[in-house]
């Protein structure tokens, strides 16, 4: 089994025809839009759907998932959206890529390295609208997605994060990197907006444009949720396909089991 067609395509040709593509699945009933959602930050700031919230989510904040590109887009986003709040989820370790080399990168954590790079371009007041939330418990993670006005997802050619599909299920308006694995889920102008991975200016512009277009955000979010339900729903789509795959293997084993063993050598 492979969860995505892109991952299946990375196997040598003789093996590809033997791979069945079935995603792990997400619970689209549990992760659904909630117009009444609210989230409290720092015990005193309550955010609702009336607020302008930009979300960026990773297990760890690292270049493999485009953290550096997102941070480089922040000065322009904060400048053009004076009321926006930036919610960044992720720890300060690495999950996939290499760790920074202090002698080359000036630090030991990607989170701090790229924050320090852009900090001189951002005023103290604007920096106060940027929130690093670390790793959130799941019961707080879902409201964060439901709260999002625009959700940003960036990645090198690599496996898709569950968080992207959960953002789609939550009805987020998504701006994502135009990298091959994403083409399976984020279709430009249908289920989201795609931008060049390395072009932080284009990312900032697309985010700001989308924040000015509530009807377009609604359309993209509804389309993204419908796509997630159709292709990635755990109970209605993925689990039945997984069980069918297992049953096919069991049937194959039963046939093999009926073959009589050869008589032992004398």
Where are these predicted regions, by residue range?
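C-terminal alpha-helical cap of glycosyltransferases
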Residues: 234-266
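Conserved acidic donor-binding segment of nucleotide-sugar-dependent glycosyltransferases
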Residues: 188-189, 193-200, 209-214
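A short, well-ordered alpha-helix in the C-terminal region of glycosyltransferases
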Residues: 202, 209, 216-231, 237, ...
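Nucleotide-activated donor-binding/catalytic signature segment of Leloir-type glycosyltransferases, i.e.
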Residues: 90, 99-139
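Short hydrophobic beta-strand element within catalytic cores of glycosyltransferases
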Residues: 173-176, 186
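Conserved donor-binding/catalytic core segment of Leloir-type glycosyltransferases
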Residues: 1, 43-65, 71-76, 86-89
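Aromatic "clamp/platform" in nucleotide-sugar-dependent glycosyltransferases that forms part
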Residues: 156
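Donor nucleotide-sugar binding/catalytic pocket of nucleotide-sugar-dependent glycosyltransferases
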Residues: 1-50
